[in-house]
Amino acid sequence: MAGFIGKERHAIDEKGRLMIPARFRRKFESVTVEGVADAFSGLYIMKAPDRSLELYEPLIWAGMRKSLSGLSDFNPEERLLKTLMYESLEMVELDRQGRVALSREFLDHAGITKDVVIIGADTKMIIWDPQRLAALLQESADRFASLAGRYF
């Protein structure tokens, strides 16, 4: 199945809930992962270093978790990475209306007060405060060609 593709603008309600776009929710309808119930109910949300939020479906997070669990607790850098990743992570439930509740800690991290831009980035959804995203795109506009040339 195709990954998350596209961009949508949504608002956070007064209780800190975010509506997940219907086209992204459809991707969850048949998710089954070892250790996760057949009926999808949650996503994994992470505070990203660039001050955005990233939402992962259980199948993708399971792969990341497997990679993290392979790291050594006795290697200081690997242990630090595990600590930083898990400190930045929460599981959020999807309610019947297709919303997830975002904690104040996560909203503050991303500078989100009301509106958000949700970007489908194949294996994850990236959630941005619209002003922060606009600033990033403005600052990075001249780097796009060189980045694309380097990686494609």
Swiss-Prot record:
SUPFAM superfamilies: AbrB/MazE/MraZ-like
One BP term from GO: negative regulation of DNA-templated transcription initiation
Cellular component terms per the entry's GO annotation: cytoplasm; nucleoid
Subcellular location: Cytoplasm, Nucleoid
NCBIfam families per the UniProt record, alphabetical: PRK00326.2-2
Keyword Hydrolase in annotation: no
Molecular-function GO terms, alphabetical: DNA-binding transcription factor activity; transcription cis-regulatory region binding
Subunit structure: Forms oligomers.
Protein name per UniProt: Transcriptional regulator MraZ
Family membership: Belongs to the MraZ family.
Species of provenance: Pelodictyon phaeoclathratiforme (strain DSM 5477 / BU-1)
Residue ranges constituting the SpoVT-AbrB domain according to the UniProt record: 7-51, 89-132
Main subcellular location of this protein, as a coarse class: cytoplasm
Record keywords, A-Z: Cytoplasm, DNA-binding, Repeat, Transcription, Transcription regulation
Gene that this polypeptide is encoded by: mraZ
